[in-house]
Amino acid sequence: MSLDTVVEDVRDEARARAEDIREAAESEADEIVAEAEADAERIREERLAEVDRQIDQEREQTLSSAKLEAKQERLGARRDVLEDVYDDVEAAIEGLDGDRRRELTETLLDATLAEFDDDEDVAVYTHTEDVDLVEELVEDRNAVVDGEIDCLGGVVAESDTSRVRVNNTFDSILESVWDDELKNISERLFDQ
């Protein structure tokens, strides 16, 4: 075996070893690249998913805001309609006259005076235009018209003896009925 052969064998062995190292390095590099590409793909998918979540969240928020705004507008419109109805009822009550007004006023006066003892002197207050009517209705009773109040009609009565004050005005009756029946009124108006 000559020196040339030995050198050639060493070179072949070195080349083979270099080839093995190069292949191992390429394989490792391929693994690193594949891992990096997989990481990049995972990060890209996570970011896309996050963007999709944000888009969905913003869409839901926008939709919720629009629904809330629409609901508030509907409620505002309903409130306006209910106020108009209330105003119309007030106007109808204020427009009562003749026998119907007398009948209602007398009924309210009777209910009011029933709250006081028979021997109590009762001061009665009423709507400006009803003073003559109420004076006529309190004749021969333990009551006297003592003044006017700002109301649609009906009476307010009080007694110094018992410190009782009874409000049976059309206004107070309307408010009471309105409060008690608001849900039913709303359902009838808006078919809920």
From Swiss-Prot:
Q: Does the keyword RNA-binding apply?
A: no
User: What Pfam family is a match, any one?
Assistant: vATP-synt_E
* Topology with respect to the bilayer: Peripheral membrane protein
GO biological process terms on file: proton motive force-driven plasma membrane ATP synthesis
Q: One GO term of the cellular component aspect?
A: plasma membrane
> Which InterPro entries does UniProt cross-reference here?
ATPase_E_C (IPR038495), ATPase_V1_Esu (IPR002842)
UniProt GO MF annotations? ATP binding; proton-transporting ATP synthase activity, rotational mechanism; proton-transporting ATPase activity, rotational mechanism
Taxonomy, superkingdom: Archaea
Q: How does it assemble?
A: Has multiple subunits with at least A(3), B(3), C, D, E, F, H, I and proteolipid K(x).
Function, please? Answer: Component of the A-type ATP synthase that produces ATP from ADP in the presence of a proton gradient across the membrane.
Q: Which HAMAP family match?
A: ATP_synth_E_arch
Name recorded for this polypeptide: A-type ATP synthase subunit E
- Specify the species: Halorubrum lacusprofundi (strain ATCC 49239 / DSM 5036 / JCM 8891 / ACAM 34)
UniProt lists the gene as atpE
